[in-house]
Amino acid sequence: MKHNRQMPDESLENIKVLLNPKLGKPVKSLTSAQSKACYHTLISNKNLNKTSDEYEKLLANYILLCDEKYLCKTVIPDSRFWAILCDNCQKLRSETLVANLIRIFNVALKCQDSNKNEVIVSICHISRENSQLIGILLQLLSQRPIHIPLFTDTILCITLFLKCSLTLCETSLSHAVEFVPRILILLFQYNFPASMSELLYIEDLQPLILEEFVPLKQRLINFLSSVSIDDYSCSLKADLLTAIKDNSVFQKGLEMEMGDLPSINLLNAYDTFTFLNSPNGSFKRLYTEQLLFGENDFPLYEAIFKLSDQFRRLFNLSGKKENQYSDSERDLKLQIATAVLNRQTCFYKTLELFLRFWIESLAKSQSDLVSLLNLAIITLKYVCLSSSDLEAAIQTKSLLKTQVVALDSMRYKFARTLQLDSIKKEQYRTWSSSIASFDTMLSGQVRDYVRHQRLLQLQKGTWVYAENPLNPEAGTPKVYFLIVSDNHANLLAREFETQTNDLPYLFDNKILTSPGSEALANGRTKVVVLKHITSFKSIELTTPSRRTSSNVYIKLDEANVYTGVELKDRNDRTVLKFYLDTEEGRYIWLDGLKLISPFQHEDISEDTKEQIDTLFDLRKNVQMINLNVRQDIIVPPPEPSDEDEDEEFYNLETLKKVTQNFYFD
């Protein structure tokens, strides 16, 4: 009996020599026989961990030194091993536990034996039976200060764990439908997304998160979307029904809307479950009010299921990105990664936005639901991928906060504006190859129209200063009357001492005035040939600011703004110099002369450019209304041999016809 009691102790001493470098030679990997002996000894002496601090160290060293095949074939599939590791994990240093799990996950992924599926299933079982192991890893990432080597290994370890679950998606669907949702829910429960969002901005951690973890999570999400909840037996369905029953408002909503839970995919179920288990107080209040007082109940579950599918498509990293939302590929990845990592937060906020849109738009039908779904997705796309605030948010490391605030503050009217812009961009993109020639033609037409508009104004004539009105030595500055000739070839100017009561007029290419005002005129009409003007020089002149008198309640700064204009010929000689005293005068005369000039002048004012752009968009939008946007109903052009067939596609001639009999107001 004494000999039998000492055997475990003697065996334990033997493995100390193999596993503890302090007592023997430098540590080497164990052989298969040594691995077997050590494992049996550790299992037999598992209760020693309650009385000795050496046991967990031996266990940790054993995991690192165990023969790879034995570890894969015997140790990992053994539930006793996981129970022992779970009992001792709190005593191990964080670095040691992470290193042990990395070894286990790597060995399992590399396993080529027929029992690989059993090995992977055993690892995924810890999400249910020994979830504190993964919980410790997730909690490590919320600790501060940030220890880069430990955090890098921890993220790698979690990534390997997800890779194990992804392997099940290929080898055992029945197990995958059970464990993949459970693992993602485990990450959600430990607030893992928030921790990763903060670490996303750490330069040393960013590549691992962006290139490894985020795409991996998205692949798991894609898997969930491909499997119906009724195809396999899984606990998620029961958990979802329990979550619905635990909240009377949401249970009533399901009964009124659908009666029973329909056949949905696992991703729909996962998104619904996490939503019901989120802090959704504001949504619940708004939804309850809508059920009580709204005329048309919000179809909550149909909205969740549809939004779930659209959300996945929008942030699908594995798919082709048709649009680039940022000039920087890195910034784009950060934006998508933030949305993928914080899927539940963004999903919840978008669903709340969906509900607000339903109430504000007085929606009531299925077509309204589809329309608002598109509106919500376009809004989400703008907020998460293309908003002008995102660049600053990336710099301040507050991308998620910026996205959440933007969704909370989004207004229905502005969202509809975003939707209109999106529709126009999609239509332009679809027809870009066919419409390029039309754009060139339309641009010329719009510029000609604005040119003609200015010409009509220039032919009415105007008073301008002939001398600098801000020159105190000039006294009362003389003035010019300017007008463009009937043949549009000349700019005519005549100097006057001051403005006349009667507006001068043009006759035979000369500026004339009434006999009573002729005494105020100086000299003859000056003719400036427009084709001789090669450049327009302008400078803004401002009087010193002066305040209103002190006996008024509101004091305003007053300042007069003038524009000095010089018309120069090819030799840089000034052929005419005058001063405009209003913004309107600058807008009409300076831009107008540039537009009617035979030379091309691009330096027109922003107001005129805006007018041209607005008119161009107006004309283009009118003709785009009649064009289909769906690719499947765009008839391709016929082959060159089909000359006798009618043209059933939109080409330049068709686009020209669209704008016939169209006039600007």
Swiss-Prot record:
It is found in: Cytoplasm; Mitochondrion. Forms a transiant heterodimeric complex with DCK1, that acts as a guanine nucleotide exchange factor (GEF) for the small GTPase RHO5. DCK1, LMO1 and RHO5 relocate to mitochondria upon oxidative stress and trigger cell death. The DCK1/LMO1/RHO5 signaling module mediates mitochondrial turnover under nitrogen starvation conditions via mitophagy. The DCK1/LMO1/RHO5 signaling module also plays a role in cell wall integrity signaling. Its main location: cytoplasm. Present with 486 molecules/cell in log phase SD medium. This is ELMO family protein LMO1. Forms an active heterodimer with DCK1. It comes from Saccharomyces cerevisiae (strain ATCC 204508 / S288c). GO terms for cellular component: cytoplasm; mitochondrion; plasma membrane.
